[in-house]
Amino acid sequence: MAVSTIVPSDYKEQDSTVVLQTAMDLVSNKFHEPVKSTPLVNTVEILEDDSTMVDIPEVIAAPEVTVLPEVITVPEVATIVLPSEEGSSEKIDRSLRLSDVISSVVEPAAGAKKLRKMLLETNELIVCPGVYDGLSARTAMELGFNAMYMTGAGTTASRIGQPDLAIAQLHEMRENAEMIANLDPFGPPLIADMDTGYGGPIMVARTVEQYIRAGVAGAHLEDQVLTKRCGHLSGKKVVSHEEYISRIKAAHAARVRMQSDFVLIARTDALQTLGYDACISRLRAARDEGADVGLLEGFVSKAQAAQAVKDLAPWPLLLNSVENGKSPTITVDEASEMGFRIMIFSFATLAPAYVAIRETLARLKYEGIVGTPKHITPVKLFEVCGLEHSMAVDKNAGGLSFMGGV
């Protein structure tokens, strides 16, 4: 008994084990039966919609999975076989669209793999709006950003109402990052602030491990002292070159132990006190110890930012854009032209949120009305936060809670 397969016209090579396992999982879910598989080459028929029907004849399920080719290409496909009762020759007259399989190959919560793939397979600038809570992250996702950044300043301000002065610690940062990273298991990867790693090498390793388990795609680790402050404040102090590199070593070793694609971003705040050359030296050493990306915080000019990219090429650099901070404002186009690979906007949602909240509350205090725009209804806000998905989950499970709508 075999299941026919329709292959989309734009079907590309896929890892055979991934495609087969995904297909078998889909069939198991559809027919509520365990399945076995075997590869099969057969004829191809072009359908009206330019997809390809692969006609698969009856085959017998083997007790073990046949050895697979390295890749499956059209017309070489996988036959999905359902077990039958002894002596039965009944065929299942249903088809499985391989388009469903291909779309399902994307792995949930594989943010690190997505981010690393973006860095390795494209030369495009990865633009990450700074988000700090569920609504700001949902809004970034609604607008289709390919990646996001969890800002430490925003997390500290929103979760505990404090300034960015090393007050938020690992548990607050990890919990917030985990919530944001898992809003949508198929959503954009999340880069997070990891501050100093919250201690010595042991704590740095623990932080990386917890971030990886939380689904964070990557994080930046800096060289400030433990009593650190926001990178766009004056008076920053940094640890020695040796102590900083020990943090990087610990982070890299933890990532290797976890067998993760977690992207380790080495950040230096030494520009204020030690100068440009010391920053480049620290970043080169971090690169040599396993860091994937560099971040020189607090550029004093656009020319200096462009020079850093040249001095560290071809190693990818991340640019932190904080308007009205210590660095000049650099646009996305300018950063791309300079050769930066990632650009984060730490205050992109935090600062506008404060402005909007303050203006609204002032209107309430002095005019007695909030003045919410007519199109911003409760339903609209809940839709941004996944209302339709939640209703679909209930419906697919046989629930009746939302039959009448909301």
Which sequence ranges carry the predicted segments?
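N-terminal organelle-targeting presequences
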Residues: 46, 61, 81-84, 102-110
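N-terminal acidic, proline/glycine-rich, low-complexity intrinsically disordered segments
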Residues: 1-12
